[in-house]
A protein has these predicted regions:
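Short, solvent-exposed loop/turn segments at secondary-structure junctions
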Residues: 73-74, 114-117, 156-157, 179-181
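Phosphate-binding site of ATP-dependent enzymes
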Residues: 105-108, 133-188
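Short, amphipathic alpha-helical segments
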Residues: 47, 51, 85, 89, ...
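Conserved N-proximal alpha/beta basic substrate-recognition cap immediately N-terminal to
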Residues: 1-97, 116
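Short, solvent-exposed polar/charged micro-motifs at secondary-structure junctions
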Residues: 75-81, 118-123, 160-165
């Protein structure tokens, strides 16, 4: 049996009524490996690096979560300045500024620039987090200054989507494949 079928059954909503032939949507494992072979490595960074992704696709007027700041180790880039942050208190001050700029949401997302899919290396910071135990903030600061992170506006999900699972941001993903004849197929 092909175990990828079970995975795709739920990811692509085959349990819903109306799917006549799921083989039109399933990517068999052997085809998946073929897709990876055809993948152009030159464009991989556009899809895996969240900062480059935002810079690239924001030019197409796509609605994306706004980047408020980003860092590379201790150097932080804000819209109008570059600052170096070396202490936890400086980091907390920056978080307060970013959170308070968000008058409606009173919160921000902090995501690792790369390798933050599936909620991994992603943190939600609100006003309440900035007045609570700084042990968690200290761990976050240590993590942030070792790498690159984005500081994004907090996305408020529609109430109906939030009812599915309020602890997660539910997103839509598209699986595509472009063959050697430059014809693109949308799988799901």
């Amino acid at each position: 049996t092909d175990t990828s079928l079970a995975d795709q059954y739920f990811r692509k909503y085959f349990y819903r009524k109306g799917f006549k032939d799921f083989n039109h949507y399933v990517i068999p494992l052997r085809k998946m490996f073929k897709l990876w072979e055809l993948d152009d490595k030159v464009y991989t960074s556009i899809l895996t690096n969240k900062l480059i992704f935002e810079r690239y696709f924001s030019r197409s007027d796509l609605r994306l979560a706004k980047i408020l700041a980003y860092n590379e180790n201790s150097v932080f880039f804000l819209k109008d300045r570059v600052i170096q942050i070396n202490t936890l208190s400086e980091f907390i001050d920056l978080l307060r500024i970013l959170v308070n700029e968000r008058s409606l949401t009173k919160g921000i997302f902090i995501k690792k620039t790369e390798d933050s899919h599936g909620g991994r290396n992603t943190f939600k910071i609100t006003d309440a987090d900035l007045v609570s135990d700084s042990h968690d903030l200290n761990k976050l600061f240590d993590e942030v200054r070792r790498s690159g992170f984005l500081f994004q506006e907090l996305v408020i999900q529609h109430k109906l989507l939030s009812n599915i699972y309020p602890g997660s941001l539910n997103t839509i993903r598209f699986d595509t494949y472009t063959d050697r004849n430059n014809i693109t197929y949308l799988y799901s």
